[in-house]
Amino acid sequence: MPMDYQTEKHRGFAFVEFEEVEDAMSAIDNMNESEIFGRTIRVNVARPVRIREGWSRPVWSDENWLKKYGSAPLEGRKLDEPDIVNPSDTSENVEDLSDEEMRTKKQKRNLPRVFFDIRIGNGDAGRIVMELRSDIVPRTAENFRALCTGERGFGYHNCCFHRVIPQFMCQGGDFVKGDGTGGKSIYGRKFDDENFQLRHEGFGVLSMANSGPNTNGSQFFICTTKCDWLDGKHVVFGRVVDGQNVVKKMESVGSKSGKVKEPVIISRCGELI
């Protein structure tokens, strides 16, 4: 890029992609504020973006992205805010809706969607797309969304489903130990139950695993049947909207004890537009 003549700083960009989050964070620690050919360089995480399915174009190929985020430090950046729905774009007469109803409709139109690409054994099983109820449990939904994108430096990438019980659920999210005894949230190790408004009403429900009241971390489960006995004990925060067949494939390698016959891995994850 051209030199900034106000500050007389030379500006340029370089991007390095790492397979493991830990390797990327170590590289940042080692290289940030280091000196190359007499010039100090700044190294941080490229701002994560929401992607469309099948879209693999690197963020730095977008000129607008470079102008907006290339020279800004990671700290202090705001995450993407949901689009505001223009009432004129809806088919309903907005004059017939109360303010509360309008807010509810806008929130529902802007619910975040995230995805898991699942690998079972050595083969790709497919993609699961999940919709998060940020309108009802915003803290819980944001925790899951951020762990899907990995924007905090840790998350679900390469995490396993360590416990799968047919006709019950598939549990995962322990990216610390991988056996159901670890995990952490974006708010610290644990956070409180937000509310129990949503119910375990059937196949595809997303809910937080816990070890008692107010012990939510990163572990979660996907219901494969109605689990109403869990209502009031586990916080429901979303549902599977696509890839139900992939969940069934995962369920098929489970057992009554929960031990999986083949490894079930989240090979890739993120947020969809």
From Swiss-Prot:
Protein EC: 5.2.1.8
Sorted UniProt keywords: Cytoplasm, Isomerase, RNA-binding, Rotamase
UniProt GO cellular component terms: mitochondrion
GO terms under biological process: protein folding
Location within or outside the cell: Cytoplasm
Domain RRM: from-to ranges: 1-48
Protein's name according to its UniProt entry: Peptidyl-prolyl cis-trans isomerase E
Organism: Schistosoma mansoni (Blood fluke)
Organism classification: Eukaryota, Metazoa, Spiralia, Lophotrochozoa, Platyhelminthes
